[in-house]
Amino acid sequence: MANASPLVLIVDNSRAVTGALNAMRHATGPLRPGIAFEYVLPSGSTGRSVLEADGYVVHELPFVEISRRKVDLLRYVPMLLLNGWRLRQLAQNRNASLIHLNDFYNLTGYVARFFSMGQLRVLTHVRFLPQTLPQVFARPWRWLAEHAAQQVLCVSEAVRGYFAPGHAGVCTVYDPLPARGEQQPPYVVSGAPNQLVRLLYLSNYIRGKGQNFALEAFKVAYACNPNLRLHFVGGDMGMVKNQEFRRELEADAQAAGLEEVVQFEGFAANTEVAMKAYDIVLNFSEAESFSLTCLDALYYGVPLIATDCGGPAELFEAGHSGLLVPNRDVPAMVEAMVSLAGNMALRQQFSTASRLFVREKFAPAHTYQLLADCYRQVLARA
């Protein structure tokens, strides 16, 4: 049966709830029912329940990603072809008009388009910072995006800079603000002499996400201000390497004698509740194409310290609505943590200014409405 609205299949590699998956949820939600969406996730992804709770139909395919494991390398091409055929069949059975790849390393949509004899349209979202990826992979992915996709969406100007200047099929579409708005009371900056200052690091435990830098900086900052407390909150996505990374961080904190002031917790389903319980949000990632975590902190008005690692620099005005520190610069992180923790007036300024800034820059016309325009343009070319 034909759909009353055009159907877009969102293909996402997330095996758990990630920033990329949440960003798409925030973007597609306001576009229903004018455009219908169904998601395609890896088999066994824990993101399925979240999407189904939002009312989406979810399909699964056994995606295989390129990795250092020999078994994955051997399986990659055969499974890419098989999943491409399955995706083409799924699109045909569901009468889908468009496949939206939620990152450009997922090549399944291109294979599905090939098997459809060019009938399927493909839109590719670039959510990694390609400049930081192994170029032996990134360059072919870029070529495919520029030549095989009908539209390429970059989540920031930092990402857009990797693609050919002036390419008509490449544009920047920022991720939207939380679709449900604020559900909790407005954030209030608090502080008094000798009061604890709580620092939140909200990120999955993945190497490169910067928790190690935060812990190193906190060791020095805590010696300067014993009222500081640091909480790491995030999931491991069920991956052994992420579990090992968390254990390394916990062992490091214990070896430094900080187990009473540094805490480690699991995945937080409600970002707003988590963030509003703290005084400062930290994000010291080594590379971010955008950073939904930073955007959420700014939206809720929780003072932010972030590294200059790509996309975050576009999310706020450094020094006016947040602090931006050089990438991998632990002394600068220490200085920012100590100075902001001890300056309630500056935290209040950041809280007020950040809320205003993101609501203007990431208004619907610059985010999900622009995405809808891209869908319509691609569909109109059929």
Regions picked out by a protein language model, each given a short descriptive name:
Residues 50, 231-259, 346:
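Short, structured helix-loop element that forms part of the nucleotide-activated donor/catalytic region
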Residues 8-9, 191-209, 215-218, 230-233:
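Conserved donor-binding/catalytic core segment of Leloir-type glycosyltransferases
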Residues 83, 101-107, 126:
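Short His-centered aromatic/hydrophobic patch
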Residues 303-306:
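Short hydrophobic beta-strand element within catalytic cores of glycosyltransferases
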Residues 18-26, 197, 206-223, 244, ...:
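A conserved mid-protein helix/loop that constitutes part of the nucleotide-sugar donor-binding site
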Residues 10-18, 30-74, 159-162, 238, ...:
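N-terminal strand-loop element at the rim of the active site
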Residues 267, 286:
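Aromatic "clamp/platform" in nucleotide-sugar-dependent glycosyltransferases that forms part
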Residues 317-319, 323-330, 339-344:
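Conserved acidic donor-binding segment of nucleotide-sugar-dependent glycosyltransferases
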